[in-house]
Amino acid sequence: MNNPNLNQENGTVGGWRLPGFFLVLAGIVLGQAVLYGPSLIGKKILLPLDILAQSGVYIPQTAEKPQAVLHDMIPTDLVYQFEPARQFAVSEIHQGRFPWWAPYQYGGVPFIWPKFSPFLLLECLAKSPGTLAWVQLIAALVTGTGMYFFCRKALSVGFWPATVCAWCFPLTAFFTLWQGFPTALAVYWLPWLFLAVDRTIRGTHPLAAPGLSVVTCLTLVSGHIDVAGQVLLGSGIYALWCWWRAHPGTWLDRKARTTLAMVMLGWGLGFLLAAPHLLPLLEYAQTGSRTMHRNAGIEERPPTGLQALPQVVLPDLYGTTEKNSAFIAPTPEKNLLESASAAYTGVLATLLVAPLAWYHRRFRAGNLFWIFLAIFGLSWCLNLPGFVPLLRLPVLRMMSHNRLLFLTSFAILALTANGLETLLVGGPIRRRWWFWLPTILLATLCGWCLYRSVVLPAAISTQADFDAFYLRKWGNILAAGDVHQVQAWFIRHYTIMAEFCIVGVIGWLGMWFQKPGRFRLFPLLAFFLVADLLQFDYGRSAQCDPALYYPDVPALKEIARFPPGRIIGGFPASLGFMQGLNDIRGYDSIDPARMVDVLKTTAAVPSTNLSYAETFLLAPRGKLLPPSGVGLPPVLDMLNVRYVIFRGVPPPFMHPPFQSADYWVLVNSNALPRAFVPLTVKTLATGQELKELASPQFNPADVALVTSDVELPARCRGTVQITNEIPTHIRIVAQMETPGLIVLADNWDKGWRAFWNGRPMPILRVDYTIRGVVVPAGTGTLEFIYRPASVVLGLWLAGLAAIVLLGWLAVIHLRSRQNQSPNQIATG
């Protein structure tokens, strides 16, 4: 987007020459080593395992193992959801199976963890969590080198501006705050995607469009699909800009139309290559509770307003949820990673270097686009008119738009690259009247931070005010902590932010008063740009003692030696899998609506209910049955919930069959086997099943509820037993005295196929959410095989796209050889 002839001074060390490129890599590695060094060398684990050591979570609380100090209460998903999912994927892959179906939650659901992600597949090479830090380093290298090549090829800046931006991009707040979450993985491909779009539209490389296909596929499969959609949305906006700039006034001519078609073809092939991931995910999402809520217009993260704007340059303005701090941001912000602070790219990059991009006229057209992209990324958080209604349109409202902030960060760094280029090769910097604008802004921010370090916010001015604030925001004053420690944290961080603002003011004054000549303080400026980000990043991600990594719980291990059955209670859903147990609850970001509806009918009144994870902490109604039993709602009997886990010490009148420190487990003797034959089958009109299931008189052994007519005797008799199973294949041996309905208490999903003695059979939705098959009298084998049509179609589409892509590459290769031949003849 800039003049490519500006690189003459830097070409001797940059580009593809190895010494220069190794310097790029070394800077990226050094930044990650500073942040995650203990985990990279194996002394720590890059997971917030201290969360597991909190009271009532997972690790037993005993006198020998007191409650650990909590680093941050927010990144619970890393240990509650994503690490159990990774371990399940590791288990399946190491047994030679691909992880399509997750039986450890909700009675079984499609496994939607981004299993095709190259980053997550690398994490699955070993069971050890030590791989997590190394994959984080690889991801940083991917996005950092992408930023380098984008700056060099698309922005046409020199080696050093591109290198500094490559060092900075993996350190920006979005990546740091979302470290470890699959949420951010698609964003690591953002520079490569923008570069592929730029090269395709400008037609500067024959492999650009095929490369766009590959990078589009990698973006779609690497992380969460909504963030991948936002990355592609940003690339679409950039494509329109590049197209408009490449074909000024000739947008309808043949060349312009061909260029646009090539971009669309590149994106289209990328979507087809990602079809095995996309199609099953979208199919499952249609059944999801959270999806239905978003379709209805319910917003989990509504816009904040202009009060969020200062966080872009003062990210710790409202504190954090980390230890010895408090998050006092205005409603509706609840934590730092979902706030505008995720756009932080460094106050020096934003207010010292980026404004210099406007110094030379040749940069200004491109700068207008980057300013627009930065505003677009902030639009949801700032509740900007015009943007927010657009982002609330169908399809777009399925995304969490507060996460568009990575576009703001990328745009600021693009402006920073232009600003650094101005300093290095743009000639002497002469005074401009507008230099005082960022200078005054930085001075104002500095003064405000110093003022706040003396006059603290009202919410933390006294212990009483702090307790009252915590009670309003979190409904609990017990976790508020000592206000003096919180005050010290705010004073320290306000002072640090003021110091960096002072550095920015000094930088502008230096440019105002400097003598004409070459800018000689570039190394110092580069140091401060990186240091600015490192001081924000350092210590944000918890790195914990390996001893905290899901230690064995004897009471839970003992369950595995007894009759199989699902569990409930004791700790957040999914953690049971780390002990080899399957929980009927779950949490997977989609949540199957029918299973959620059924489980909610069993919830005790004080049971915790999170709108985004309605069964995550669900505690069921029930009663203790001395000496060792427990009674549960009939629905849980139907769902094979055999073991109920409690914490602490049992009452004197109970003698649990399984007990260890802080854990005791009771057996629900009324739990049905996972496969059974109900005595009768009752047909109901659609919509009446939940009412019947919620009745205390419902007996799942006596009656099964269906919504379609079946021809069966008044009373069905037979015995069934599961003889063999893996997550995607279940074999049941049946001896039926009469025709009957074999019920499998697993979640119904359209991807399953049933075969009775090898003959395909229809699968009925039974009892609102589980599955059943009508079989004739006699002895036979019923097999359930998970073979979703969406996966089969996705594999065919991906194969077709791969063939087209390979053919395309072959044509490019042949044309390249044909073009070389005449040149060789002429040379000869």
Predicted segments — roles?
Residues 1-3, 8, 21, 164-166, ...:
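Contiguous transmembrane helix-bundle modules in multi-pass membrane proteins
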Residues 16-107, 282-289, 538-541, 545-550, ...:
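Hydrophobic alpha-helical membrane-insertion signals
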Residues 30, 147-156, 197, 201, ...:
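Transmembrane-helix signature of membrane-embedded glycosylation machinery that interfaces
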Residues 39-154, 160-189, 307-340, 754:
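Active-site lumenal/periplasmic loops and adjacent helix-entry segments of GT-C-fold
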Residues 52-79, 83-87, 91, 97, ...:
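Periplasmic/ER-lumenal interhelical loops and adjacent helix-loop junctions
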Residues 54-55, 59-60, 293-302, 486-494, ...:
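Extracytoplasmic
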Residues 127-155, 341-361, 497-511, 791-816:
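Selective detector of the "anchor" transmembrane alpha-helix that sits immediately C-terminal
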Residues 574, 585, 642, 651-652, ...:
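Active-site-proximal, structured, solvent-exposed surfaces of multi-pass membrane proteins
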